[in-house]
Amino acid sequence: MIKKLRGRFTTGRALVTTLLILIQLVWFATVFLNIIDYSLVLDALLRVFTVIMTLYLIRKNENPAYRMSWIILMGLLPIFGGLFYALFGNKRPSRRMAAQVANQVAKDYGQAVSGAYPHLLEQDSRLASLSYYIEQTSNLPVYGDTQVDYYAAGELALEPLLEALRSAERYILLEFFIMNPGLFMDQVFEVLAQKADQGVEVRVIYDDFGCLTTLPSDFVAQMEAIGIKCLQFNPFTPVISLAVNNRDHRKIVVVDGKVGFTGGMNLADEYINEIERFGYWKDNLIRLEGPGVWSLATLFLDMWNAFYPKKDINYETFKDDTLSERALRLANPSQGFVQVYGDTPLDNEPLGENVYRDMLNIAQDYVYIYTPYLVISYELQTAMTLAARRGVDVRLMTPGIPDKKMVFRMTRSYYRPLIEAGVKIYEFSPGFLHAKTFVADDRLASVGTINLDYRSLYLHFELSAMLYEHPVIPTIKADFLATQAQARQITLADTRNTLTGMLWDAVLRIVAPFV
């Protein structure tokens, strides 16, 4: 079944889509330039419109770097700048998308119940305040009695993931940004097909843009034909639209509501180092077992019910009553706490960024960070430098071999001020680092899908699993230190730049919020 997916015009679809968008851009530009040549009035109106958009942006409550980039662009392009911002500058999803998700989340509110918060508050009021903020923003509570296993590489997670899928008796939920047929995806979908044939309910969500060059356009039909319900999130069409910005970057696997997985991994062979793309691919995944899995299921079901044509989900049928009872009584609070949360572009609350900033503010001893990209706001940069200046051991690890050279150049442009403030920066020499992880003080960690870049922090649907006072946290710290032994520490001498290089970095900083 999976073999049929390979080589079926996926590259052709991406090429045709790109060409059609370019044709539209050229057509719009040609029409406007020709009209402007014959209309001084239109020229003046467009310039006035650009001024109005600039004033609107100045007063808008939005990320300062994002606003400044657009203001500079509109200053350089006084005729078309305002029009470009009107077409492409709004970070919010389409009204239809916003309404679909907001309505579904509103219906779901109150589904999740947990008795863990008072116990966390008793153990550590500062961690509890962060947990409270997350619950108030995402509607997902903190849970206890949830076992967490940490896999420090994709190939280590493969067999536990397959074993969990094989154990399914009621349902499997699977959501990924990228799915690319190969050994990894083939093995997963062979199990899914077998389970669907056995009567297990199987549902799959994939992001269409993430899979534009890897899956055929009839993938949904192929899955439905073998009993797997499938949702193509935000289909990518060759029409100029703001909606293309908002992607589903989450990674979720849930089995029977009892076991769940999340982390940085997608369903592609490079993630398990079956193939080599940019040297060794360093990623991670966590396995949850217990009441905390319900939040992963909730995020999946919210997305499904918001966008699937048939509203066919009753949340109660996906719950495990035994785990719900455990969530309320919390038999063993000493085993730590887990809180999965989702971040969305539907509001003006950059939840993921705020959580990262608060982790840096909470830390007293150390904060170790994995990130594939470093294209951050001034506020997050300040949180890192302030933590380092008050004596916290802040260490940041990025790839040694990049997947996107321009973004890697942007990443390195942030090194110098961080190093000057005392942040230690390492580049993973063997290859590409794709994990998105914070760990602090042996009592707090975050493992999920949220990169340190503008798209991840402001535009995408994301998730992360917060771990409070959990026994797995030292394992995450140990993984960072072991990986650090394979990395090269960056010094101030490494960040020296020529005048041309500094000018180029300045230009890249201007476009950073768009990347």
Question: Where are the regions that the model predicts?
Answer:
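Thr-Gly-centered strand-to-loop micro-motif
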Residues: 370-371, 398, 428, 447-448
